[in-house]
């Protein structure tokens, strides 16, 4: 999570991602091999390509109060006190409305980002190597236990459930041992 000052510094300035500062501060502790991809992936402000409004709710570790950074991407931003049960950060995007068809019969459809698969694909494509876990609730299905009194004609029943899943790998393929990388990982890369 971030304090109000960190929200101001990291999100309030378009050209500042915090990466270079982090690299400088931590180079001595971690040696010269500090590999940094922006703390917020490839360009936090790219969110406004698909969102009409962005809200970041963040509570720094050890702080009693959370802070809320909000912007429509046009007229600045606000930072106010807010609430969050635990430390961490939530980024909430209000997607733009789908565009009407143009003369060529094409339109931008932002609702494609609302599918679980679409969102996971975007995260893995653009933020797979962010060093912090990016988690999302995913829908899964599992077989219910077979009742003890079920007959030979029993047909398995399934139930849907939600589970929090880490979507990004957090470790770039080039930082892994070759023995830990499967062929499918190479193919995807």
Report each predicted region and the residues it spans.
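GHKL/Bergerat-fold ATPase module in large chromosome/replication-associated machines
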Residues: 36, 57-75, 98-101, 105-112, ...
